[in-house]
Amino acid sequence: MPIGVPKVPFRLPGEPSAQWVDLYNRLYRERVLFLCQELDDELANQLIGIMLYLNAEEQNKGLYIYINSPGGSVTCGIAVYDAMNYIKSEVTTICVGTAASMASFILAGGDRGKRIALPHSRIMVHQPEGGSQGQASEVLSESQEVMRIRRQVGRIYSERTGQTLSRVSRDMDRDQFLSAREAKEYGLVDQVAVDTKWSTN
């Protein structure tokens, strides 16, 4: 049985008493965003709108995007990536479970030094997919667009990771799963978060 979105108390500045707001709205006020489902037009527009609003409100404060997503629409992923790099606020991306497909693209798109994977998270990269139906000319046009997008995504992965374009293209040919540590070595993230409760150091 679904429990819905939990409500938490929050007192607005200047208000005498707290009011109950849903958890996500409360966290938005702390500049914390979530990509925790398949990325589609609605979610992409919501993330972009929140980023633009928070950037306009306070450019000197960073944003935090927590990611646990199977990916989703390529064009939506590119739109979110572009918005992250358009705003002035620093963007920290944090993988808290799985960042697959376009979710790994967004993870890699965080500001340098601020791309984090939790110790047991996993990251997957692969080539953009496209499914075409219709007349031959339409199928050809669609396949050309998919190839153009694949080159674009590969080039951005290469820039963000420091890997050569040829290696990125080769790695994108099939689903490539990486542990948090492997993702750091590859350059998709800058750090693996430390397990503070059980660390012996």
UniProtKB/Swiss-Prot annotation:
Cysteines joined through disulfide linkages: none
UniProt-annotated catalytic positions: S101 (nucleophile), H126
UniProt keyword annotation of Phosphoprotein present: no
SUPFAM superfamilies membership: ClpP/crotonase
Cellular localisation: Plastid, Chloroplast stroma
GO CC terms: chloroplast stroma; endopeptidase Clp complex
Keyword Chloroplast: yes
UniProt keywords, alphabetically: Chloroplast, Hydrolase, Plastid, Protease, Serine protease
EC numbers for this chain: 3.4.21.92
Gene Ontology MF terms: ATP-dependent peptidase activity; ATPase binding; serine-type endopeptidase activity
InterPro entries attached to this UniProt entry: ClpP, ClpP/crotonase-like_dom_sf, ClpP/TepA, ClpP_His_AS, ClpP_Ser_AS
Domain of life: Eukaryota
A Gene Ontology biological process term: protein quality control for misfolded or incompletely synthesized proteins
Enzyme's top EC category: hydrolase
A Pfam match: CLP_protease
Catalytic activity: Hydrolysis of proteins to small peptides in the presence of ATP and magnesium. alpha-casein is the usual test substrate. In the absence of ATP, only oligopeptides shorter than five residues are hydrolyzed (such as succinyl-Leu-Tyr-|-NHMec, and Leu-Tyr-Leu-|-Tyr-Trp, in which cleavage of the -Tyr-|-Leu- and -Tyr-|-Trp bonds also occurs)
Assembly with partners or alone: Component of the chloroplastic Clp protease core complex.
Function in brief: Cleaves peptides in various proteins in a process that requires ATP hydrolysis. Has a chymotrypsin-like activity. Plays a major role in the degradation of misfolded proteins.
Family designation: Belongs to the peptidase S14 family.
Name recorded for this polypeptide: ATP-dependent Clp protease proteolytic subunit
Taxonomic classification: Eukaryota, Viridiplantae, Chlorophyta, core chlorophytes, Trebouxiophyceae
